[in-house]
């Protein structure tokens, strides 16, 4: 046996083309990598001081691609141990100390020479908004404590501030659209282009104490107090945004409990949103301390109530509806609930934070229709507590609340914001967009550091990731073509 001389030559050619093609590919990769990874990476840190906890986000980008051409990525997301800073009313200093652990974790990832050049921000949201209403001197003490700790850490600390609900909504919207590349995009032809406005997505955020809805409506925004304007990459955007204080998940759960206690005061509270067979003791005092609760505990009640789950989704939905004032919108056009103006919904929406966490647990993040979502949550609410508890042994402190928060989200989106069976498919439940966690923090940092310029960049023609990918793809195609041609030739001869 043996190959003919012709076949040997062809095999040799084939091998050679394969090897040289591969070499070219490797060279291209090495060259491109050295272009894409210059030594100077910049960093930025944002603390998201929410009502239930604080998170640290570390972002990084290339120093030579500032002013809009850079792509910011997330290098670290760290959950601060302990509760939100607004809980440290009796020991403000500890609120500052609690941030140390995550900060140290972030500093490990940043070269020491750059520590002092790393812009660091702390933004507080609805938890502190509520506290400063209730007792502004306590809120001031807490801000002073976190400012002191971050001010003496080896970073470039820009300050701690209370974010208004509108800013929280707007920055969440910027984060989503920046992550998705719907504000500006690098095209295959090597130009920066502006995607059509229909590509912009709305943002639905739900924290512990407040919830935000932000989108670009199709028509004018009639209530100017709900309008936020900004200029990004040379385009003007007018978004509708509203933040509902006391409609975050945790405050909603407290208000729900109080509503049930008030409507039927008794030492044994039967809770329709807790699964049947669930039982616990509830201390009444702390429940009524929330600034979102405007009632006093019935005098006839003991300090501690026994709470029993009944797993009744119908009764649960009725109790949840009591948290909304739908009648205040009756007869008014473009009104959501509690008398709040809302223009007609438009386009795609990303629902994140507690929207995502709740629906992720319930396996409802894969674009199920509204009827399936409803049926799934109702089915979950009717499961016996014993079975559910056994499936998730001690791993989830929110386990008893998923029925309530699932039905709450459904009520808010469907009856509150007005998503119907037809518009429900425009909702995506997501945690991330373009590799970054969705929240207000990235949009906030981009804005404060001026990394999204108001004007369109003049010369945006640097090597981009998209072009690099295209090059690789074309090289691979070329390689495949060469090999294919050689193979055809080879088999053709053997015929
Ligand atoms: C970005 O813009 C600022 C001022 O707008 C300028 O000082 C800086 O040099 C610019 N950076 C780059 C890399 O072009
Ligand atoms: C606010 O808190 C401080 C200290 O905890 C307390 O002395 C003060 O009475 C509180 N003020 C109000 C209005 O509750
Ligand atoms: C209420 O419950 C707490 C523990 O949850 C307990 O420390 C307290 O003594 C109880 N109070 C009364 C009046 O039973
Ligand atoms: C609902 O809003 C209307 C109009 O703002 C008000 O008159 C009514 O008292 C509210 N209902 C409740 C239950 O708060
Ligand atoms: C979600 O799906 C997983 C895997 O299919 C399953 O184990 C889990 O029980 C489901 N969760 C709920 C709440 O039904
Ligand atoms: C959810 O399902 C229940 C029971 O099947 C039904 O009564 C209710 O109207 C449904 N809700 C929605 C929003 O479809
Ligand atoms: C971004 O920051 C500038 C000041 O640097 C401010 O005027 C502007 O309103 C901010 N944008 C948004 C959306 O808040």
From Swiss-Prot:
Assigned GO CC terms: plasma membrane
Membrane topology annotation: Multi-pass membrane protein
Post-translational modification: N-glycosylated.
Family: Belongs to the GDA1/CD39 NTPase family.
Gene: ENTPD8
Positions glycosylated per UniProt: 67, 304, 363
Keywords: ATP-binding, Calcium, Cell membrane, Disulfide bond, Glycoprotein, Hydrolase, Magnesium, Membrane, Metal-binding, Nucleotide-binding, Transmembrane, Transmembrane helix
Pfam families: GDA1_CD39
Parts of the chain on the Cytoplasmic side: 1-8, 493-495
Transmembrane segments: 9-29, 472-492
Organism from which the protein derives: Homo sapiens (Human)
GO BP annotation list: nucleoside diphosphate biosynthetic process; nucleoside diphosphate catabolic process; nucleoside monophosphate biosynthetic process
Activity regulation: Not inhibited by ARL 67156.
Record's comment describing the protein's domains: The transmembranous domains are involved in regulation of enzyme activity.
UniProt topological domain (Extracellular) ranges: 30-471
Protein name: Ectonucleoside triphosphate diphosphohydrolase 8
């Amino acid at each position: 046996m043996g190959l003919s001389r012709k076949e040997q030559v062809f095999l040799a050619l084939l091998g050679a083309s394969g090897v040289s093609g591969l070499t070219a590919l490797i060279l291209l990769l090495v060259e491109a990598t050295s272009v894409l990874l210059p030594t100077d990476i910049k960093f930025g840190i944002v603390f998201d001081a929410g009502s239930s906890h604080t998170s640290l986000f570390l972002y990084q980008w290339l120093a030579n691609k500032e002013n809009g051409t850079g792509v910011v990525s997330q290098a670290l997301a760290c959950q601060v141990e302990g509760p939100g800073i607004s809980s440290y009313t009796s020991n403000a200093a500890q609120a500052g100390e609690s941030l140390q652990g995550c900060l140290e974790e972030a500093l490990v990832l940043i070269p020491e020479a750059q520590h002092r050049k790393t812009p660091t921000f702390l933004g507080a949201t609805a938890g502190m908004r509520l506290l400063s209403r209730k007792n502004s001197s306590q809120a001031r003490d807490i801000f002073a404590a976190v400012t002191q700790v971050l001010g003496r850490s080896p970073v470039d600390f820009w300050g701690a501030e209370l974010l208004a609900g509108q800013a929280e909504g707007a920055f969440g919207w910027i984060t989503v659209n920046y992550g998705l590349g719907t504000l500006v995009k690098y095209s295959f032809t090597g130009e920066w282009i502006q995607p059509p406005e229909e590509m912009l997505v709305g943002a639905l955020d739900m924290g512990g104490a407040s919830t935000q809805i932000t989108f670009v409506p199709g028509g004018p925004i009639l209530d100017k107090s709900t309008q936020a304007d900004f200029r990004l990459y040379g385009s003007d955007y007018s978004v509708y945004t509203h933040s509902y204080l006391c409609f975050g998940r945790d405050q909603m759960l407290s208000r729900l409990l109080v509503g049930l206690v008030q409507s039927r005061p008794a030492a044994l509270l039967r809770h329709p949103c807790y699964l049947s067979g669930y039982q616990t003791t509830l201390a009444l005092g702390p429940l009524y301390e929330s600034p979102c609760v405007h009632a006093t505990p019935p005098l006839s009640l003991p300090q501690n109530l026994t709470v029993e789950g009944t797993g009744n989704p119908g009764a649960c939905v009725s109790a949840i509806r009591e948290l909304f004032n739908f009648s205040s919108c009756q007869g008014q056009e473009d009104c959501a609930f509690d008398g709040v103006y809302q223009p007609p919904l438009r386009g795609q929406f990303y629902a994140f934070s507690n929207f995502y966490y709740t629906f992720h647990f319930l396996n409802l993040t894969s674009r199920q229709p509204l009827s399936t979502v409803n049926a799934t949550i109702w089915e979950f609410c009717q499961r016996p507590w014993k079975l559910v508890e056994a499936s998730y042994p001690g791993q989830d402190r929110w386990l008893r609340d998923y029925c309530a928060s699932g039905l709450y989200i459904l009520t808010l989106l469907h009856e509150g914001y007005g998503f119907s069976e037809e518009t429900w498919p425009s909702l995506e439940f997501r945690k991330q967009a373009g590799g970054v966690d969705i929240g207000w923090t990235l949009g906030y940092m981009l804005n404060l550091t001026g990394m999204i310029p108001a004007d369109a960049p003049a010369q945006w023609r640097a090597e981009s990731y998209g072009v690099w990918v295209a090059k690789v793809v074309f090289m691979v195609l070329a390689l495949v073509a060469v090999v294919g041609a050689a193979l055809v030739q080879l088999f053709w001869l053997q015929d």
